[in-house]
UniProtKB/Swiss-Prot annotation:
Localization: Cell membrane
Designated name of the protein: Membrane-associated lipoprotein
Domain of life: Bacteria
Lipid-anchored residues (N-palmitoyl cysteine): 26
Entry keywords, A to Z: Cell membrane, Lipoprotein, Membrane, Palmitate, Signal
Record bears the keyword Transcription: no
Lipidation (S-diacylglycerol cysteine): 26
Signal peptide as annotated in the record: 1-25
Pfam families referenced in this protein's UniProt entry, alphabetically: Lipoprotein_17, Mycop_pep_DUF31
Protein topology in the membrane: Lipid-anchor
Domain Lipoprotein-associated type-17: 143-237
Amino acid sequence: MKKNKLTTLALILPITILTPIVIASCTNKTKVKKSSSLDKIASNLKLEYFNNKANTKASSVQKDEIKKPLNLPNDVVFSVKDVFVSHKDQSVLIVKYTLKKGNEIQEYTYEIKGFKSVYEKDKIVNDLSQANEDFKKIVNNIRLKDTFDFKLAAFPNQNYDQLLPSQIYKNYYQGIEIQQHKYQNELDIKIINFLYPDGDFGSANKNGTLKLSLMLTDKKNNQVYYKLLEVSGFKSNPYGVDENGTIPGIGTERLKPKNQDDYFSKTQLQRYEIDNEGYLQILKRQNNDKNWKELRPDLNATVSDIKHFDEKAKNVGQDSYESAAYKGFTLPVYESDGKISGLALAGKDTPKGPSWVDAIGRNQWQIGGLPRTLPNEKYRQEAMQTFSLGILNNDSHKNNTYNKTAGTTWILDYQKTSDNKYPTKWYFATNLHVADAINENTLSINLMRLMDSAQIKTTFRLSNLDENIYNFGFRSKEHGKNLLNHGLKKIFDGRDFLKTKPAEYLINSQKEKYKDVGNFTDFAVFELDFEKLELVNVWKNFLGENNGLVTKYNNYNPQELAKVITSNYANNKNNQIKFLSKSYLSDYSKIDVPLKYRQEDAKTWFKKYDELFALGWPNSTEDFFFKAYVDDDQLKYRTRDNFSLWTNSDYRFFNNLTQQEGGQPAFPPERTERGNYLSYAIGFRSFIQKPGIVDAFIAVPQIGNNLYTSSDNKKYINMGLEYLPKHFAPAGGASGTSVRNQKNELVAIYHAKYDSSKTGLAAAFRSEGYDYQGLYGNYNLPQYDLIYGGGKDQTEKKSYREAMKDIYQNNNIKTALFPDGFDKIPDEFKFNNN
C-alpha cells in the first residue's frame, strides 16, 4: 500500500482568479473526439506550478497557481478547469485543463509530480481508496452535526452556525474542540484546516460554506487518512461581507481588457475610461441596478447641468457626474437656473474594489503587502527609524482597568544640543487617531523596534518571539504622575488645519447637519524627553531570558538610552529624513511609471522614477503567511498583542530571498532592490488621469460608517490631498506608517486600510492646491504644508514648524529639520502664489 506523509497546510490566503467567461461557457460543451489537432499540442505541453513544489502540499494548490505553458501556440487558449490530488499518490497533482482553437475545444489532464510528502508530525497518511470497506462506508457517511460538531476556542459562547466562514477561517488556529457523536469506537476525527470553497471569503460568506480538511484515524489499525469535506450551514449574508463589514473585492479578472498590450500603450485618460466602464458595471450590479438618483437622493441636477459639469470635469481631470455619484463622491447640487447651490456629501463610505493593474501576475487576494521581511537596505533604513507605539491608559470609569492603544510611529525630528551630547528631546509622528489616546490618564508608553542586528532578506518572527525585536517601556520619572507633560508632550495635530469649515461648501440642508463638524488630516506629532523618562521594562523574545536586559539598559544614562532607541539617528546625517517639496499631484511625471518596458531596459527603467517605501507594525491577526505544524510555536501567539513587521513590497518575496551558497537568487536585484508605486484603484481616484491621487473631501470625506470623533468629542471630516500606496493593506496597528521615496523624502502618512481594494489612504504632508475652475462651486483642493506651513488655505499655527515656534518661543531652540530656528520657511517649501 502506498504511504505518504501528511503535508503541512499553508495558512496563506487562498488563491482564485476567475476564468474568462468565454472559456467557462464552453467547457460544458466539450466532448473528447477520436482525433483532434489539439491532441498533438497537448502531448507537447509541460505544465508547472508557480512556487516551490518541494515545500507545498498538492492539496493546497489552487487553479491560478498553474503556469501558462511557454510553448503554447498564439492561436490556442489555455484554461485550467480543476486541480485535485491523485488518489494513488498525494504528492502528485492532477490538472484538468482545456485547449481552445477557433470553435474547437478539448479537455485534457496532466500530472505534476514532486510536491511535498504528506505528513503531520510523525503520523503516516494512507490512500483512502485502500482502506477496508467498512471504514470507507463510515468515511462516506461523515456529516457535520450528524457525525461531529466543533467549537472554536476564540468563540467559546457561539456555535459555528452563528459565525461567518471568514470568522472561522481567521480564528481556528487558536484552537478547535471536536465533539464526536458517532463512530467513537471506530474513528477519530481532527480538523486540521479550513478552506474557502471558491478561494475567497466573499462567496463563502454569501453561501455560508467552508471546506474542512479532516484527518481521520481508523482506531482498529491506527491508520491515518485525509478527507476534504465541504460543509454548509454557517452564517451568511447576501453580499458576502466579512465580520468587519468589508465587502469582498471584485474579481480583478472581470475588469481586465481583452487586449492588455493595447491598454498599456494608451494614455492615462484612455486607460481610466476603459477601467471605469467595467468598474461601474459591477458597482451598479452590486447596487441592484438602481439609478444613481435613487442612491443619491441628496443630489439634484438636470440633463443640462450634468452635461455642463461633465464638459468642465474633463478639462480639470475629474470624474463625470453620474460616475462620481455611484462612487459616493461629493458633488454639486444645482438650482433651477443652473447655478450651484452647494455641495452634497454622500453621508457614507462607498465600498471600493481592487484594480486589475495592481494584481497583474499576482494572486489578487495576497497583494496587501509583505510581512516580516526587509527586501533591501532602503526598507531596513526605514525600519531603523520606525516603531510600534503602545499607549497604556488608566480607564477613568473602571478601577484596576487599563486601555491600550497601538499604532506605528517614526522619527520626525530632534532638538540639537549645544554641548555635543547626544540629543534627548525627540519628536515622533503618527496619526491623530493614534495620538488621541495620549491624555491625562496615560501611565506609560512602549516603543518597539527592530534592532541593528536585523538583516535584510531574512524572515523575522512575530514581534514578541524574535531576538531582533526589542520592546522598551517608559513611565515618568516623577513617580505618582502620569506621563502627559511629564516626559511626554503633545506638539501638533491636524484638527482644523484649514481655515474654511466644511459646512461652508455644502447645500443648506447639510450646512445645519454639519455646522459643528471640523476638518482634519490624520497627522500628529508628540515629544519624548528621555531626561524625564524612566525605563521600566525591556523585553525581546518572551519565551527566552529577558531579566538581564532591564539591568543592562537601566545603567544607561538618558543620552545613551536615546541613542539605542533611535539607532544613533542624530549621528547618521545622511540617513535623516527630508520632505518632498513638490507633491506628486503637482508633478505626476515623477511617479507615472510605465506598465510595460522593453526587456533590454529591465535593469534601468525604474531609475527614472520615484519609488515608494512603506513600513509599519500591524497586529498579527491578518498575517496568513504561517504554516500549520511548521510554525505552530508562532501560530498560537498570532493575536492583537503580537505584531508583524509589514512593508508595501511584493508578497512573493516571502521566504524566497535567502540565497543558498553558490545558488542563484529567486528574484533578480532589479526587483528586490526597488520600492513600490501608487495604486490604480478606481473607487477612490478623483484625479482621473493620475492613478493613486485623491482629493479627500471629494472622494473620501468619511472613512467607514461614521465621521471621526476626536478626543475633544468633536466630529471631523477628512480633507486634503491623499495618496493610494500600491500593495499596502495591513491590519490594525499600522496606522501612522510613513510613506517615503528612495531619497528618504517623506511623502505621506498612512491612516486608513481598504482591504477589499488592497490599498489604503495616506495623507500628504504637502499640497500646492488645485483649481477646479468652479466645478465644485467655491471649493478647490486646499493649499497647505503640515510641516513648514505657509499655505494660503491653512489655519495659522497649524503646522509642525509653527507649533514648535509657539511652544518654544524665545528659547532659541534648533532642530535637525530647522537648524536656523522656526521663523523662516526654507525656500524650496515656500508657495508661489503670485
